[in-house]
Amino acid sequence: RAVASLVGQLYAYLNGKKCEVYPSPFTVRLFEQEEDRPEDVDTLVEPDVTVVCDPSKLDNTGCKGAPDLVMEILSPSTQRHDKLTKFNLYQRAGVREYWIVDTDSKSVQVFLLDDGRYAAKDFGTVGDKLKVNILENCLIDLSQVFPN
């Protein structure tokens, strides 16, 4: 449900703009180089929500290189992976903005890439509207993400 709300709000905002939103399953090949074949890339991730603003990164197998925005919804089984492993992968790959969405605590942490490292940018909970920093004037209504 959180994914559907996030994708819906982003889709409505991005309508007619150059960026595109993709829900999971959408494959991202983080460290692919120009000369690599897609099947040779070993760092594959499938974020819950992905926003790509550079159409040249898109092909029929997904996204080649770092997307602009990634949102991950925590679950008990993925919590450590999303907060540590993926956090570090996305940071190293150059994903400009990373949202960690916790449906248990009904909260969102927003990290923004600053000089190659993520800096905690924002925190929000039910009733808040959080700014998507890489998209001008884009706000996500968390009361729609975490309905009562």
Q: What residue ranges belong to the model's regions?
A:
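Gly/Pro/Ser/Thr-rich low-complexity, intrinsically disordered segments predominantly at protein N-termini
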Residues: 1-148
